[in-house]
């Protein structure tokens, strides 16, 4: 498997190996003491493999490609999309963490913007891979800085981690908040405060 490390995305050129994934799930069922040939589990390896192909679909698509389309709107004020539903997978335990992402940017001097759905799509593609929330937040911000050439970017993610809710410390409902600020949002306190006020306002 070859990977590109030319930016913070991790993209694989390999295709999803359905047969290998099915075999791995079957072995896991045996390892925990189950019978993978009993009626309820007979098709489970194939179902789980297909599910993981979807859950990790972001490994096979470069999020930068999503941001190629730009529109000349001569817009010089903040663009913010709030409460983007987000599902990802903790790379430490391979269980879900889920919540919402808030993504904002100030267009560059050329006033060009990208489609609002593209921001949600970038969140989705970075989330659909083995992740940690801190890295996910930064990757989204860096992709926007890299492709949109904006004056500033802010990304805030609020998520519940099932690895904290289902096992270990077992604290369901605990929410982890991470942020990444770039450009003007990092250097200008007023811009950052305005963005955070809009994000926190319900």
UniProtKB/Swiss-Prot annotation:
Q: Do you know which InterPro entries this protein is assigned to?
A: GTP-CH-I_C/QueF (IPR043133), GTP-CH-I_N (IPR043134), GTP_CycHdrlase_I (IPR001474), GTP_CycHdrlase_I_CS (IPR018234), GTP_CycHdrlase_I_dom (IPR020602)
What GO terms in the biological process aspect are recorded for it?
one-carbon metabolic process; tetrahydrobiopterin biosynthetic process; tetrahydrofolate biosynthetic process
- Tell me the superkingdom of the source: Bacteria
The protein's annotated pathway: Cofactor biosynthesis; 7,8-dihydroneopterin triphosphate biosynthesis; 7,8-dihydroneopterin triphosphate from GTP: step 1/1
Q: GO molecular function of the protein, one example?
A: GTP cyclohydrolase I activity
Where, by residue number, does Zn(2+) bind?
A: 90, 93, 163
One GO cellular component this record assigns the protein to is: cytoplasm
Gene3D superfamilies in UniProt = 1.10.286.10, 3.30.1130.10
Enzyme Commission code(s) on record = 3.5.4.16
Record field: catalytic activity: GTP + H2O = 7,8-dihydroneopterin 3'-triphosphate + formate + H(+)
Q: Which UniProt keywords apply?
A: GTP-binding, Hydrolase, Metal-binding, Nucleotide-binding, One-carbon metabolism, Zinc
PANTHER family attached here?
A: GTP CYCLOHYDROLASE 1, GTP CYCLOHYDROLASE I
The UniProt family comment states: Belongs to the GTP cyclohydrolase I family.
> Oligomeric state and partners?
Toroid-shaped homodecamer, composed of two pentamers of five dimers.
Q: Which HAMAP family match?
A: FolE
- In its UniProt entry, what is this protein called? GTP cyclohydrolase 1
Q: Which organism is it from?
A: Mycolicibacterium vanbaalenii (strain DSM 7251 / JCM 13017 / BCRC 16820 / KCTC 9966 / NRRL B-24157 / PYR-1) (Mycobacterium vanbaalenii)
List the gene name.
folE
């Amino acid at each position: 498997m070859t990977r590109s490390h030319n930016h913070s995305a991790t993209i694989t050129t390999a295709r999803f190996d359905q047969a290998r994934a099915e075999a791995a799930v079957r072995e896991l069922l045996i390892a925990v003491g189950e019978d993978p040939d009993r009626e309820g589990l007979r098709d489970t390896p194939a179902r789980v493999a297909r599910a993981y192909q979807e859950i990790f679909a972001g490994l096979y698509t470069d999020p930068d490609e999503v941001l190629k389309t730009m529109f000349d709107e001569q817009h010089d004020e903040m663009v913010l999309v709030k409460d983007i539903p987000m599902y990802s997978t903790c790379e430490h335990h391979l269980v879900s963490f889920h919540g919402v992402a808030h993504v904002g940017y100030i267009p560059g001097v050329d006033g060009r913007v990208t489609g609002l759905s593209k921001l949600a799509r970038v969140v989705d593609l970075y989330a659909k891979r083995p992740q940690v929330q801190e890295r996910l937040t930064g990757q989204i911000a860096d992709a926007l800085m890299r492709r949109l050439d904006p004056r500033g970017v802010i990304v805030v993610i609020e998520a519940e981690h099932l690895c904290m809710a289902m096992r270990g410390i077992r604290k369901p409902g605990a929410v982890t908040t991470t942020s990444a600020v770039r450009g003007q949002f990092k250097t200008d306190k007023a811009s950052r405060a305005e963005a955070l006020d809009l994000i926190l306002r319900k």
